[in-house]
A protein has these predicted regions:
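Conserved AAA+ ATPase "SRH/arginine-finger" region at the nucleotide-binding site
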Residues: 132-144
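Short conserved motifs of the RecA-like P-loop NTPase core
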Residues: 159-172
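Conserved AAA+ ATPase "sensor/coupling" helix adjacent to the nucleotide-binding pocket
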Residues: 132, 146-159
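Short regulatory helix/loop adjacent to the ATP-binding pocket of P-loop NTPases
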Residues: 116-130
Length: 208
């Protein structure tokens, strides 16, 4: 995900602190598309599972069974991504879940590209969500995106010049998930053609 540790320090510290809290809590994370929300939510789940807690990650973009969201209150951590895409039935289910966790220790973290006030959801749900702790994820600049991709590439033992990324941002996309998936494609092609990933190589493969 497109996520800046430095810029989002307060949010990370707040979430870290929730792991030692005994009461339920609701956090609303907003930010632009491809801005690291998914990365953050999945990070919460990994950490919770690492502490032997019951945790579930749900992406509203994917088709979900009916009466699913309102059955999650026995989980310690529930992370729900893309709640700006909730159907009306799911909005009611999330509202029910919100009310149920008042009696539990569940930590509910939800994400959307808008702030609670801008969501087109049921009035009661909007009211509840505006009571959540609301954080806006800060957008990364190009250099921070490049640093983040470079860290990911080190895990894959891929050494690509920063200039190649800057070029991709300019001619291809600034969306991190799109750039990462095209790098996968370039990596496979470079292995197949035994050629390093350079700007001329990118031009050839992407026919730019």
């Amino acid at each position: 995900g497109n996520f800046s540790i430095e810029k989002n320090q307060a949010l990370l510290a707040f979430i870290d602190n929730l792991f030692s809290q005994e009461h339920s809590s609701v956090v609303f994370v907003s930010g632009d598309k491809s801005n690291g929300k998914t990365h953050l939510l999945q990070g919460c789940i990994f950490k919770a599972l690492g502490q032997d807690l019951k945790a579930v990650y749900v992406d509203i973009k994917h088709k979900l069974p009916t009466d699913f969201l309102n059955t999650l209150s026995d989980y310690d951590w529930v992370c729900i991504d893309n709640i700006d895409q909730l159907s009306e039935i799911q909005q009611q289910e999330l509202f029910d879940l919100y009310n149920q966790i008042k009696q539990t220790k569940t930590k509910l973290v939800v994400s959307a590209s808008k702030s609670p006030g801008e969501l087109t959801v049921l009035k009661d749900l909007k009211t509840r969500l505006s009571l959540a702790v609301v954080y806006r994820l800060e957008q990364l600049d190009d250099q921070e995106k490049i640093d983040l991709i470079q860290r990911k590439m080190q895990d894959k033992n891929l050494d690509i010049d920063d200039k190649v990324y800057a070029y991709l941002f300019k001619v291809f996309s600034r969306d991190l998930s799109e750039v990462l998936s095209v790098i996968d494609k370039l990596d496979q092609e470079s292995l197949r053609q035994k050629s390093p990933i350079s700007i001329p190589f990118v031009k050839k493969i992407l026919k730019i």
